[in-house]
Design a protein with these regions (language model features):
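Positively charged, small/polar-rich N-terminal and surface patches that mediate targeting and assembly
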Residues: 1-89
Length: 89
């Protein structure tokens, strides 16, 4: 057995879950998290004032799979979570 931990963008969760179900992986633990990497946050406007948002919302997926499914699961997660933008990891 192997444990896979993946950090993805929140809006990709359904797509990743569906892709995992297609390869018969249905047990996933989902945790909401905040973090930053090269993105370093962003600025938002709220009621006329600017605020720095240092931490960006993320989703942490923890998945335990049989050894023979590990490579395929990692490939499926990588492909289905891909956006082509900074923060993909």
């Amino acid at each position: 057995m192997k444990k896979i931990t993946a950090i993805i963008k929140p809006f990709k969760l359904d797509e990743v879950r569906d892709a995992l179900q297609e390869i018969d992986i249905s047990g996933v633990t989902v945790t909401e998290a905040k973090g930053f990497g090269r993105q370093k946050g962003h600025t938002e406007l709220y009621r006329g004032a600017e605020y720095n948002v240092d931490f960006l919302p993320k989703i942490v997926l923890d998945i335990v799979v049989d050894d023979d499914k590990c490579d395929k699961a990692c490939e499926v997660i990588t492909k289905s979570a891909y956006t082509g933008k900074i923060g993909d990891g």
